[in-house]
């Protein structure tokens, strides 16, 4: 079958022909319809330090997808051939303490689809049926293909009560922008997002951010004054992994403020812990999506009118995958969809 693979320990992704995956007793075989390019895929493409330590070569990559079930393992219940599904890209062990306690997103033995095992940039994908999510009919394929990163946004944004709160989001990548849309949809008062990329800040404005701030041109303190904020932000969502952005967030938080961190900073990051302590800040690390509460919330948010369509800015056939990767690497895109239809 046709697949996109990391074939060489250098910059690039290559179209290859690989054997179709084998179906296990508890698995689903999914015919892929659409996939989306993730920031992780760009790290793998660029063959950065993380990729060199993590990705076995060769490896079929990709983990954001929607497809149709075409075969079912003999032990599987609850799915049928023809079901339209997306799926959780974190394969968990099922036997560690967190898995047994129902906190599967915190499994210490997690294996990543398209990272540690063959991924979704292929004509067919096999995953455990446990990881599949059956999609409502009114969730279109393009949105279903980005449920993985949308789930990161939902998990992060809904970590804290948002109704009537003022929210600061640092990092206007696609996940940060979707988080801004979620915050507004569920009732936040002001949602301010910061970045240095004007293209993506404009996307954030289209998605409902109260203010999208280029921190090279504008001070957050001035924006807060314009919005009539006198006590700081109630909730912070750190999506950038940039130390200076996190420092600024800590400075601008209200006493008792709550911060959820999804962005991955450098290996070490110095912060003023005195401010954290004396402000009584709560900081929570976010990894992946809660299985499967986040997935049900994603579907419900879309069904209740949340419009994510502006975040999808580029669409290509899989044969033109290089154009898709070029668009993502340029920084002048939102989400990029690759279609696998003939």
Swiss-Prot record:
MF (Gene Ontology): L-threonine 3-dehydrogenase activity; zinc ion binding
Swiss-Prot/TrEMBL keywords: Cytoplasm, Metal-binding, NAD, Oxidoreductase, Zinc
Cofactor detail note: Binds 2 Zn(2+) ions per subunit.
GO CC terms, sorted: cytoplasm
EC number(s) recorded for this UniProt protein: 1.1.1.103
Primary enzyme class: oxidoreductase
Cofactor(s) essential for the protein: Zn(2+)
Alphabetized InterPro entries for the sequence: ADH-like_C, ADH-like_N, ADH_Zn_CS, GroES-like_sf, L-Threonine_3-DHase, NAD(P)-bd_dom_sf, PKS_ER, Zn_alcohol_dh
Residues annotated for Zn(2+) 1 binding in this entry: 38, 63-64
Subcellular location: Cytoplasm
Subunit structure: Homotetramer.
Family: Belongs to the zinc-containing alcohol dehydrogenase family.
Name the UniProt record assigns to this protein: L-threonine 3-dehydrogenase
Species of origin: Aeromonas hydrophila subsp. hydrophila (strain ATCC 7966 / DSM 30187 / BCRC 13018 / CCUG 14551 / JCM 1027 / KCTC 2358 / NCIMB 9240 / NCTC 8049)
